[in-house]
Each structure stands twice: as structure tokens, then as C-alpha cells.
Amino acid sequence: MGLTEQKQKHMEQLSDKNGIISALAFDQRGALKRLMAKYQSEEPTVSQIEALKVLVAEELTPYASSMLLDPEYGLPATKVLDDNAGLLLAYEKTGYDTSSTKRLPDCLDIWSAKRIKEEGADAVKFLLYYDVDSSDEVNEEKEAYIERIGSECVAEDIPFFLEILSYDEKITDSSGIEYAKIKPRKVIEAMKVFSNPRFNIDVLKVEVPVNMDYVEGFAQGETAYNKATAAAYFREQDQATLLPYIFLSAGVPAQLFQETLVFAKEAGAKFNGVLCGRATWAGSVKEYVEKGEAGARQWLRTIGFQNIDELNKILQKTATSWKER
């Protein structure tokens, strides 16, 4: 991949010495509030959310190559990252308009690539919901939006990480078998679209191409794919782009995510790392709400550390350097 000298430096900061991106994602806002609301009756406060992000950053960034945070609640956490950890900042508003199936993208109102860079970030991350089968009108609007962000990142000479979440406008349950059957095409075709150089994207943050809960050998009940078919989808995904790409954990349990990475490697996927969020830190939320800072730190230093340490060991065996793409 052809990077400017400045982008190259940022990419080095975001990855480990082997060129693998082992990044910790904690840019959750709406999802985090919902998670906290399970354990407390009152609305989570801004200071609560900020403090939890600080705790996770302090305890886990010594073991991550970089951390993804949001500028709304994550700025205090950006000040306590480990010296060796890079920083990504999210540029999108959380969630989407549920009154429409379009899920149009929307930047944070008072942020820009310039401002994100001024906060010390090594990359701009933007999340896009994309249904490859949506109308040309809707997808053209989304594509133009991404072009603007890409141009901003070129102007600021900062890497652009695009996170693509595939969906189907007509299927409301993305976790069911109906969507599982069409997910591979949705994920792979979206990657092809945004691999076009016109978008100026440096790294794709993507879903694995199948729902592992419906893969033979992983499924508890009915299956949507046998192992050979699932493996073929991972290979097809790998061939869909020349860009570096990393997997998101999509909130699945740590063990399943780790097993998925091994499966991807065995299938022949040359992915370049992960941006792993809830699979690493989710359990700290309950401890934080019920036992405060001390409880959260204890969890992060034991189970949280174990999650990230096991993930790192698996990444060294399964991921390849982004420099090879």
C-alpha cells in the first residue's frame, strides 16, 4: 500500500512491532449506556462513562497496540494511554435513525479530521452502515459522504479507518439464520465497493463474513454453512480487497472471537489484526457499577488481562502484517 511518510508513522504507532494491529475498541456510547443500565436503575452519568473509559485505558493499553475512543466521553481516557499505544478517534455519531431503514451516516457536529488530529489521534475511524442491495440513491449518498471524509483525511495526512457494518433493509433480525445466509455477500460486496482508491481509505474494519453461531461445529442448533463453505467465504473476503483489513469483535464472547480468528487463519485469510471491544472489557461494566473503581480494576487486572493476553497470543499466530498488503 502506498502511504505518505506521515501516514506510515501513524500506522506504525497503531500496530505492534510485527505490523499487527491489536487494538482495543472502547468508542461505544449508546451500547455502553444500555449495558450499564442493566445494572443500575438511574441513567448513567457522563462522569461515570468517562471514568470507566479511563480505567479500561489505564489497565489494558499496556497490552494493546492502540485504542479506539470517542471524542464525546473518551477524551479523558486519551490522556492515560500507555506510551507505546496509538490512538484512534471515532468521527461518527452513535447509533442511527430507527425511523428509517436507510441508516444514513452522520459525523459528530463539532468534530473534523483536523480536530481529531489535534487531539493527538493517529487515525480517524468512521462507522458506516451499508446494505449493498439498497437503492442506488441511498448508496450514492453514503459513498459521497465517505469520499468527503477520505478527502479530509488526505488533507490532514492522517490514516482513515472505515468500519463497515452490513445489514439488510428488509430483515430486522441481523442475528437470525435468514440474515446469516446472505451475510457473506453483504460483507464481501461492501468491502469491494470501499476498496476503490477514490475513497482514500487506509484500513477496513470489517465483520467476519459469516455468523459463526450458524457454522457447523460452532452452532448450538441449526446451521447455515458447513465448515468448508464458511472457510471459502473467509478466503473470498481476503481476496475482495488490496487494503489492510482488521476484524471487529461484534460483541461476541472472547472465547468465540479467538476461535473465529483461528478459523480465519486456517481458511487462508491474511487479516491484519483486530479492533476488539466488548469481547475484552464487557465484564468490567457490571463490576464498575456494583463495586466501583476498585471492583472494575480488579476485574480488568484478572479476567480483562486474561482476555487481552490470550487474544494477543492468538493474533501473533493468526494475523499478518499490514505491510504485506
Swiss-Prot record:
It comes from the Bacteria. This is Tagatose 1,6-diphosphate aldolase. The keyword Lyase applies. Pathway: Carbohydrate metabolism; D-tagatose 6-phosphate degradation; D-glyceraldehyde 3-phosphate and glycerone phosphate from D-tagatose 6-phosphate: step 2/2. It catalyses: D-tagatofuranose 1,6-bisphosphate = D-glyceraldehyde 3-phosphate + dihydroxyacetone phosphate. Keywords: Lactose metabolism, Lyase. GO terms for molecular function: 6-deoxy-6-sulfofructose-1-phosphate aldolase activity; tagatose-6-phosphate kinase activity; tagatose-bisphosphate aldolase activity. Its EC number is 4.1.2.40. One of its GO terms (biological process) is D-tagatose 6-phosphate catabolic process. Belongs to the aldolase LacD family. PANTHER family: SULFOFRUCTOSEPHOSPHATE ALDOLASE. The keyword Lyase applies. The gene is lacD. It is an enzyme of class 4 (lyase). Pfam families: DeoC (PF01791). It comes from Streptococcus agalactiae serotype V (strain ATCC BAA-611 / 2603 V/R). NCBIfam families: lacD, PRK04161.1, PRK12399.1, PRK12858.1. InterPro entries: Aldolase_TIM, DeoC/FbaB/LacD_aldolase, LacD_aldolase, Tag_1.6-dipho_adolase.
